[in-house]
């Protein structure tokens, strides 16, 4: 099962980030320990949205759509 997720930073500027993963708990830990995507480094994050998908390809397409609407 794959998840498309949106994160919100805990800092005053409220940055957002969209991604996909098969392990959301582990991925959030990586983002919060400066091991995630380059954009997320140096900030603390919380999950504000996620949705499950049965296939990686569908999750990737949905991630792309969500990134386009939030940028």
Enumerate the predicted regions with their spans.
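GIY-YIG nuclease catalytic motif and its immediate N-terminal context
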Residues: 1-53, 58-67, 71
């Amino acid at each position: 099962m794959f998840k498309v997720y949106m994160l919100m930073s805990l800092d005053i500027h409220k940055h957002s980030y969209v991604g996909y993963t098969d392990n959301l708990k582990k991925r959030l830990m990586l983002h919060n320990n400066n091991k995630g995507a380059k954009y997320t480094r140096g900030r603390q994050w919380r999950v504000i949205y996620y949705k499950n998908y049965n296939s990686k390809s569908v999750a990737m397409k949905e991630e792309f759509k969500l990134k386009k609407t939030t940028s």
